[in-house]
Amino acid sequence: MRKRTFLGLLGVSAAAMAVSLPPAQAQAPCGTTALDEVKKRGVLRAGVRQDVPGFGSVDEKGRIVGFDVDIAVELARRLGVESELAPVTAATRIPLLQQGRIDLIAATITHYRERDKVIDFSVGYFWTGQKLMVKKDSSIKSLADMAGKRAGTTAGALALQNLAKAQPKAVGQTFEGYPEAFLAMQRGLVDAVVADVIILAGLRANSPKPDDYVIIGDSLGGGDYAIGVRENDSKWRDAINFALQDMWKDGNWDRIFDRWVGPTSALKLTKEEIGFKMEVWD
């Protein structure tokens, strides 16, 4: 199945999108669903990250690659259509979905109640907790040490909210993406990066000196990554759920995991360490 990538949404803020993008049909016409639209179009438009190594990042050939990307491409293949990748950020992914610019979100988005008020979600396809990453020689060894310290992350990330609950005296600072937050820590502009553990592991693995950074502290919370879809479209959500569950049953999820996250990947994690098992229905 041919994969197409468009990069026209790079660096666009949520506010700017609302102004600059042409009007889009956020809801399918009466009597149709997103599944009907995707089938008719012949293309599945997936919102993916390009700043999360291992899940969605740009390789040396300029292609967006990663775990989430492979999941989205495999979903398209199982639906019998092509895939088109739209770069999104934590701040832009939900607005783009609501505006009808993309058909789904496959972009390290955690399913939790506040988000469920505005979009719907598939079954989970990955699980991760949230922690802090600091320089190895940092005096910060635990959440208690973050009092008065600066933690960087990306706008719209759940981790910053959880940090504020766990350590109210920590000072949060947001950046355009996780690489920018990581760079800020390297330059001493923030004292730590707070994010999903899998994201922190990817940033560390892709740095020139991975051993210079450590992931510390108790988990700030965690949850399933799931596919985000527009509300009230059960036919579309079911199609995605069944495809994800079939991937789990036939071994394709394992193949994608091993390629991007497993012991032979840059992240070098095992399924036991992740502790994830997909909800599969008979």
Where are these regions (language model features)?
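N-terminal twin-arginine translocation
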Residues: M1-T5, A14-A26
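Periplasmic-binding protein-like
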Residues: F126-V134, V197, A201-N241, P263-D282
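Extracytoplasmic small-molecule ligand-binding "clamshell" domains
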Residues: A28-T108
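Short helix-initiation/N-cap motifs at beta->coil->alpha
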Residues: G31, L85-P95, S138, A157, ...
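A ligand-binding cleft/hinge motif common to bilobed small-molecule-binding domains
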Residues: T92-P95, T108-K117, N162-K165, D191-G221
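Flexible hinge/capping segments at coil-to-helix
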Residues: V134-A151
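Extended ligand-binding regions for polar small-molecule ligands
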Residues: A28-P29, D70-R78, R150, A157, ...
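Ligand-binding clefts/hinges and TM-proximal coupling segments of bilobed small-molecule sensing domains
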Residues: Q27-A28, L158-F175, D212-Y213, L244-D282
